[in-house]
Amino acid sequence: MVKVNLAPVPYSIEVPAEIAKHLSIENMITSTPSEFTNQAREAGAIAQVYINYKAADGTMHGFAGVYYFKKADFEKAQNPDEPPVYGSKVVEENSMVVAIAGPQDSIFDPNSQDGKNSATLYTLVYDPNSFKSS
């Protein structure tokens, strides 16, 4: 397993080396600011990153968003009548939360290597044991 640093989220995620080489981390605030990233920041998101996946054909795909919140701010941002805006809480530590948003479905053929990698990565991003505080 290889640690992939999620900075500025103060965690890394451990993934198999053959998957890690396909990943890049993009700071949402500095590289792709949008109305949504501004809304997340106003809701209390301390850090926001995308996990991007580079497919075998060289195309880059957004895989998941990672959000780092104070627990109280994350809970305040939730509406029980709607899907979670900033994803699902995966790690809660020291009154802080790491939440993951996405992916909904794989865009890859499940029998392809990219499809298999995507399925493995999906399992890992929702497993609290995959994350290590940095």
Segments from the language model and where they lie:
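N-terminal targeting sequences that direct proteins away from the cytosol to non-cytosolic compartments
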Residues: 1-45, 50, 74-134
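Short, conserved beta-strand/beta-arch hydrophobic-aromatic motifs that form part
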Residues: 55-83
